[in-house]
């Protein structure tokens, strides 16, 4: 590191060089979060339900959180999405078309006691899942 009276240019150059040691700077500059994101930077995505899965809650909680494996239509990637609400999983069947969005954990990660689940189901066959859970709407028959 230059320390002299005329060392400004070297200090600037070095600080630009050593920025790449910062993990967050490198991820931001190389756009890695969008590249690795299954939704490709979009707020929501549509997908087809492959199967229903129960995910065990982390300690100290004890529960089986009802989730679904979804294959996204736009790129074929598979993600796990949480079905929010009491009995919500009963409104979701295999091969249904669902809309998912991020679960809202910090830094785009999972939330609460559900490990490895980053998404929530918002609608099933173009009907809001919450509306079906509270009984305001019925699931359309195909």
Curated annotation (Swiss-Prot):
Pfam families: Ribosom_S12_S23 (PF00164)
Coiled-coil residues: none
Record's keyword terms, sorted: Ribonucleoprotein, Ribosomal protein, RNA-binding, rRNA-binding
GO terms under cellular component: small ribosomal subunit
SUPFAM superfamilies reported for this sequence: Nucleic acid-binding proteins (SSF50249)
Alphabetical list of InterPro entries matching this protein: NA-bd_OB-fold, Ribosomal_uS12, Ribosomal_uS12_arc, Ribosomal_uS12_euk/arc
GO molecular-function terms, A-Z: rRNA binding; structural constituent of ribosome
GO BP terms, alphabetized: translation
Record family assignment: Belongs to the universal ribosomal protein uS12 family.
Subunit field text: Part of the 30S ribosomal subunit.
NCBIfam families: PRK04211.1 (NF003254), uS12_E_A (TIGR00982)
Function per UniProt: With S4 and S5 plays an important role in translational accuracy. Located at the interface of the 30S and 50S subunits.
Stated name of the protein: Small ribosomal subunit protein uS12
Organism encoding this protein: Methanoregula boonei (strain DSM 21154 / JCM 14090 / 6A8)
Gene behind this protein: rps12
């Amino acid at each position: 590191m230059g320390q002299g009276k005329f060392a400004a240019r070297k200090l600037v150059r070095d600080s630009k060089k050593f920025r790449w040691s910062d993990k967050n700077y490198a991820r931001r500059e190389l756009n890695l979060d969008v590249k690795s994101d299954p939704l490709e930077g979009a707020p929501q995505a549509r997908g087809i339900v492959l199967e229903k899965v129960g995910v065990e809650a982390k300690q100290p909680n004890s529960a089986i959180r009802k989730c679904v494996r979804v294959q996204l239509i736009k790129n074929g990637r598979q993600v796990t999405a949480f079905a929010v609400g009491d009995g919500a999983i009963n409104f979701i069947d295999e091969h249904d078309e669902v809309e998912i969005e991020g679960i809202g954990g910090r830094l785009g990660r999972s939330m609460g006691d559900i490990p490895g689940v980053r998404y929530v189901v918002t609608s099933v066959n173009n009907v809001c899942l919450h509306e079906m859970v509270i009984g305001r709407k019925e699931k359309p028959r195909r």
